[in-house]
Amino acid sequence: MIRVLVVDDSAFMRNMITKFLTSNHEIAVAGTARNGEEALQKIKELRPDVITLDIEMPVMNGKETLKRIMASDPLPVVMVSSLTQQGADITIECLELGAIDFVAKPSGSISIDLYKVRDMLIEKVLTAGRVKLKGRQVPISKPAIETAKQPIVGGSDSVRFRAGKQLICIGTSTGGPRALQRVLPKLPKTLKAPVFIVQHMPKGFTASLANRLNHLSEVTVKEAENGERAKDGWVYIAPGGKNMAVGLEKGELVITLDDRDTESRHKPSVDYLFQSLASLREFEKIAVIMTGMGSDGTEGVKGLLKHGSGTVIAEAAESSVVFGMPKSVINNGLANDIKHVDEIAAAIMTYMKKERA
């Protein structure tokens, strides 16, 4: 049984979340709190397994509460966020600070539409309940030398690709935002390949993730746009709620976004992206599967290896928040290498040099 502390300043939301969670026989609500200060006291008294934490609260907000939880005695936390730009930005910061995942309120802070995310909330709490946090959670630090970077809007200037070039593709889910912050900042701005990323995330949050990663990294990171021409040293993150494919048109890699449902229940889907890349035989692919629940990416990796040459790196169990997606790739015998998240960027660069040799 997973014991949950529900933290929200709205009595309506506390009751609603409690009702949703207790509809699952594996979850019990140990208690509730109206703000962060009260939550910290309840944590000491109740010792819950998981916390659902609202972001916007009086007395002590969710972000400050999360900082204190992670600095003292870390517990798995699922943030509950509003679908606003400010809410999205703060949510990404909370994932950076150590929150396991988040659930978006569909229509603001008080909404009957929360029923739409009931199953997602239950799933994420169950997942969080299986996570064992490893000691004090240290926030991701900025690079020692950093130039001011603005959020990227609009397409990049296209660069015509030569035969035999390389591309990098990354798939991740739960724990992915924090993992990406431990990989992308280590890639050089002179990177001789584009990077395509699928991070399972709902609409409205991937732009904030891209902006944050862009701020931390030497490479340029942006949310992908339909029809955009890809460029070396640029990182393209699939928008939440859309699938991303990459094709070749007149010597240029072109991104296509669409709303079609696929065999994967995820949108964006790692399998969908990787399968589109499989047809690009002119390119050496370096595929990376990192932390996440389930097996999205496994079929896509099979396609990459079946239709062309490629190298597959899977994140090791020791650094994965949820060892699901990488485990599936490893168990299917598809991984060329298994790396701790802090070693993945170096592995990517090593394989790029090998494949160019």
From Swiss-Prot:
**Its job:** Involved in chemotaxis. Part of a chemotaxis signal transduction system that modulates chemotaxis in response to various stimuli. Catalyzes the demethylation of specific methylglutamate residues introduced into the chemoreceptors (methyl-accepting chemotaxis proteins or MCP) by CheR. Also mediates the irreversible deamidation of specific glutamine residues to glutamic acid.
Signal peptide start and end residues: none
Q: Does the keyword Phosphoprotein apply?
A: yes
Q: Which residues form the active site?
A: 173, 200, 296
- Domain comment as written in the entry: Contains a C-terminal catalytic domain, and an N-terminal region which modulates catalytic activity.
Q: Which GO terms describe its biological process?
A: chemotaxis
Q: What is the scientific name of the source organism?
A: Bacillus licheniformis (strain ATCC 14580 / DSM 13 / JCM 2505 / CCUG 7422 / NBRC 12200 / NCIMB 9375 / NCTC 10341 / NRRL NRS-1264 / Gibson 46)
- Domain (CheB-type methylesterase): residue spans on this chain: 161-355
Q: Does the keyword Kinase apply?
A: no
Quote the protein name from its UniProt record.
Protein-glutamate methylesterase/protein-glutamine glutaminase
Q: How is it modified after translation?
A: Phosphorylated by CheA. Phosphorylation of the N-terminal regulatory domain activates the methylesterase activity.
Q: What's a Pfam family in this record? A: Response_reg
This enzyme catalyses: [protein]-L-glutamate 5-O-methyl ester + H2O = L-glutamyl-[protein] + methanol + H(+); L-glutaminyl-[protein] + H2O = L-glutamyl-[protein] + NH4(+)
Q: Which gene encodes it?
A: cheB
Q: Where in the cell is it found?
A: Cytoplasm
**GO cellular component annotations of the record:** cytoplasm
